[in-house]
Regions:
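Conserved phosphate-binding/catalytic region of the ribokinase-like
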Residues: 1-8, 32, 196-323
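Glycine-rich phosphate/adenosyl-contacting loop at the front of the ribokinase-like
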Residues: 1-63, 68-71, 308-323
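Short beta-strand scaffold segments in enzyme catalytic cores
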Residues: 49, 98-102, 109, 218-222
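Hydrophobic anchor at the start of a short beta-strand
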Residues: 58, 85, 154, 210
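Active-site-proximal loop->helix
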Residues: 68-81, 101
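A glycine-rich helix N-cap at a beta->alpha junction
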Residues: 76-94
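Conserved phosphate-binding/catalytic loop of the ribokinase/pfkB sugar-kinase fold
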Residues: 92, 99-140
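Conserved phosphate/ATP/ADP-binding segment of small-molecule kinases
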Residues: 148-153, 160-231
Length: 323
């Protein structure tokens, strides 16, 4: 009997994000009203939902509590057809991590509460996994190393180094993964370079594929096996909330692993998905589906050759309608 297979696996903390938009700065003791509100899964759920919505068979390795926020987050995630929640633990008495996001017209503020969670472990003998994502700011779990030895492609990311040290020890550990996806500020600080292009090339000394995201300016990638530097622009959208856009980018890029596309097309789809996700509030719930991609490309006709992506999205959308 053939072993079960997953395209993507995401492990980490699932949050409940409470997003308030259009929040004026209050005076001390004053009450202000937001223009919009959204409750959405956040944290690692941003990546998991984004990958699943592109048709990748995606699993979430995490836990939520039996509190009201956890129950609501669980219900939202359970509505995603391609998202496998067999490894999402529902833990009695555990408070689901929560982040309140206050978005004004020019700035954002966050308030987070998170209790210590039990460590997660991918079971031996579990389904094979095409790709997974890890944080490089802590030691890789043994189960990640085990999956990589079995053929899983390991993507890595980092967060902002609030210490300001930007230790190059991170670079020396990049041989533990296959693809590194930082944003441009992170990449330039770790490599001590002046621009994203030089940062991508420098990262290519340590990892097979380095992808540096640049927000509204697109992305640049350096592929060590070919020595090629590939740059793609982003598309222009009316941005409402950038929460989770980086997560949507990396998950969408991971979802293209089995497409057989050139690197440039994979980056273009990932960038498009990230851009479309900022048009509405929240991270996970704003990740686009193929039908959203088709609708945008057809209506807006952005510059460049989108024929491959449009054909794929249209075919995926037809499949969704038939389910």
């Amino acid at each position: 009997m053939a072993r079960a297979h997953l395209d993507l696996l995401f492990a980490g903390s699932v949050f409940c994000d409470l997003v308030f938009a259009g929040v004026p700065t209050p005076e001390p003791g004053a009450e202000v009203y937001a223009e919009a509100f959204k409750l959405t899964p956040g944290g690692v759920a941003n990546r998991a939902v984004a990958g699943a919505r592109l048709g990748a068979r995606t699993a979430l390795l995490s836990q939520v509590g039996d509190d009201a926020l956890g129950v609501r987050v669980d219900a939202i995630l359970s509505a995603e057809p391609e998202l496998d929640l067999r490894w999402l633990r529902r833990k009695p008495g555990y408070q689901t991590p929560v982040t309140v996001s206050l978005t004004g017209h020019h700035e954002r503020e966050f308030i987070t509460y998170q209790e210590e969670a039990d460590p997660v472990e991918w079971p031996e003998g579990g389904p094979s996994v095409g790709a997974t994502h890890v944080s490089m700011q802590r030691d890789l779990p043994g189960w990640v190393q085990r999956l990589r030895s079995a053929g899983t492609i390991v993507f890595g990311g980092v967060g902002w180094d609030s210490s300001g040290l930007w230790s190059r020890s991170i670079l020396r550990r990049l041989d533990e993964i296959d693809v590194f996806v930082p944003n441009d500020l992170e990449a330039m600080r770790y490599t001590q370079t002046e621009n994203a292009h030089d940062a991508a090339r420098e990262l290519g000394r340590y990892v097979e594929l380095a992808v540096v995201t640049r927000g509204s300016r697109g992305a640049v990638a350096f592929e060590r096996c070919t020595g090629r530097l590939v740059e793609v622009p982003s598309v222009t959208v009316a941005a409402v909330d950038p929460t989770g856009a980086g997560d949507v980018f990396v998950a969408s890029f991971m979802a293209t692993l089995g497409f057989g596309w050139p690197l440039e097309q994979r980056l273009r789809l990932a960038g498009l998905c990230a851009a479309l996700s900022v048009r509405s509030l929240g991270g996970a719930v704003s990740a686009p589906r193929p039908c959203d991609i088709t609708q945008f490309l057809t209506a807006e006709s952005p510059p460049g050759d989108w024929s491959t992506i449009l054909s794929w999205a249209a075919a995926q959308g037809s499949s969704e309608e038939n389910i």
